[in-house]
Regions:
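Alpha-helical solenoid repeat scaffolds
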Residues: 1-177
Length: 177
């Protein structure tokens, strides 16, 4: 255990050095491995895994040797606050099926959608909200997210019908409806 801890600590630092030298694909791949295999270093690896260009994404993705590693890349990107994670969820689903990472990204997307776009009941009188519902208007602050919310609902519905024994998808589908 102690040897593993030290080796992942060293790999975490080595990955940072690779990024500093411009070997972004290799550096991010090492952060990915640390995230996957070393729970005590996961926080550091998550925030150090920083892909800002398509070129870096492709270079890192090329390093991945298994579908699980590729899905983990999509998981990390999909959980970022500044990213709409639906495409990453589709990739995770294609690579791993109904994996726990898929459910986590969906939960984060629902949370992001809610915190960034919904008018809270305490801020608007319930009568105003009900008038918007009666008129068929969106409850979202940013109506551009209306289509995205619909896409999330379609994804949750598909996942629900393909995984009826997983109550998470019934809950996600119901919440998004």
């Amino acid at each position: 255990k102690q040897k593993d801890l030290i080796s992942y600590w060293a790999m975490d630092h080595y990955a940072g050095l690779l990024l500093q030298t411009g070997a972004n694909g290799e550096g991010n791949y090492h952060f990915l491995k640390v995230f996957e295999q070393a729970p005590s270093r996961r926080h550091s690896a998550y925030y150090s895994f920083n892909i800002s260009t398509e070129e870096d994404w492709a270079a890192t993705y090329k390093q991945c040797q298994t579908p699980k590693e590729k899905a983990l890349m999509h998981f990390i990107r999909g959980t970022r606050q500044e990213v709409l994670g639906l495409e990453d969820m589709r990739s995770i689903f294609g690579l791993m099926g109904n994996h726990e990472w898929l459910r986590i990204v969906m939960a984060r997307e629902i949370n992001k959608l809610e915190s960034n776009n919904l008018s809270y009941y305490g801020q608007l009188p319930i009568a105003q909200l009900m008038q918007r519902v009666d008129k068929g208007q969106s409850l979202l602050k940013n109506e551009e997210y209306e289509d995205y919310a619909g896409q999330l609902l379609r994804f949750a519905t598909t996942a629900y019908y393909n995984n009826r024994d997983d109550s998470f998808w019934a809950l996600a589908k119901g919440y998004l409806e």
